[in-house]
Amino acid sequence: MSLVSQARSLGKYFLLLDNLLVVLGFFVVFPLISIRFVDQLGWAAVVVGAALGLRQLIQQGLGIFGGAIADRFGAKPMIVTGMLMRAAGFATMAMADQPWLLWFSCALSALGGTLFDPPRTALVIKLTRPHERGRFYSLLMMQDSAGAVIGALIGSWLLQYDFHFVCWVGAGIFVLAAGWNAWLLPAYRISTVRTPMKEGMMRVLRDRRFLTYVLTLTGYYMLSVQVMLMLPIVVNEIAGSPTAVKWMYAIEAALSLSLLYPLARWSEKRFRLEQRLMAGLLLMTLSLMPVGLATSLQGVFTLICCFYLGSIIAEPARETLSASLADPRARGSYMGFSRLGLALGGALGYTGGGWMYDTGHSMNMPELPWILLGIVGFITLFALYWQFNPRSSAPAVAPGG
């Protein structure tokens, strides 16, 4: 094995362990926020949704700046600083007894993510070859699912005692992750050239195809973020206990660990990336629309299974497609900007979802938010089809690319 291949192999193992810490730290805390502040403290869902949307908007919306800084100065200092800021945000959340303090803690957590997320994503592109990238994304997502259920289990168990413990454990994991990166992460340059910040950002903003693709994903993310807001609330309402939420993440973990990698291997040889993305989004859309009509835990979990299956189909294709459209001379900037769709979709999905949930209940129409989300899903499908329609533009990436 050549030195380059050995470095790539060791780098991928490092990324897997680093990703596990980040996922654990996040999911110990965030799935419990809506339960803590809406169900336990009685806050309005729109208030908590606004806090979650603010985090999404700041972290992903400012990602291009975090990526551009990493293009200029390298990945390591940005990752370590960002993880320590995320830890500080979680520690502050433990003291949140008023909405402004929850919003502040979410904003601080988001700024940390703005710094560490784009360079970590760019490192995946740097350390993987194009032909293996889709499968490595699948491994990361399998790990995300396992980490999510373990984190949610830990968080649910800690919530029985005190929400302070939930936040402190999450903060501690991010401090550990920061130390891990400070100690072992080499001083990688994530782009092929040391690109000035302004040049990297302008290179992205001039790429109209990439801009269109990223903005189109806003609707996709409006649906996907409901696993952190409305789906846990619905599960908790029907079950009458927050402990049932952990089974929602257990379902995701079981499906991901058993199906994600085989599905990615099978579909990458038969379908284009954009076809896989649209097929997954269609299933997600059809699964969310009937949620408001479900009256049993079995019915809700069946729909959640279908939703997760759609996500399993779509996510590896979405990540690989984003990476394939990025200019290697400004990877950090591209990966940072690619999160803008998540920023807009997250902000609209959380805030709008919270508002729709409150409105639907006040009008005695619990199905209202889910029907509106379904409409958003179909509009997004049409936009993706228009963008990648071979009759109007060249196809994005061939199968296996």
From Swiss-Prot:
Coiled coil: none annotated. It comes from the Bacteria. It is found in: Cell inner membrane. It is a multi-pass membrane protein. InterPro entries: MFS, MFS_dom, MFS_trans_sf, MFS_Transporters, Multidrug-R_MdtH. One of its GO terms (cellular component) is plasma membrane. Keywords: Cell inner membrane, Cell membrane, Membrane, Transmembrane, Transmembrane helix, Transport. Pfam families: MFS_1. Signal peptide: none annotated. The gene is mdtH. Belongs to the major facilitator superfamily. DHA1 family. MdtH (TC 2.A.1.2.21) subfamily. This is Multidrug resistance protein MdtH. The chain crosses the membrane at residues 13-33, 34-54, 99-119, 139-159, 165-185, 214-234, 244-264, 277-297, 340-360, 368-388. GO terms for molecular function: transmembrane transporter activity. Disulfide bonds: none annotated. Gene3D superfamilies: MFS general substrate transporter like domains (1.20.1250.20).
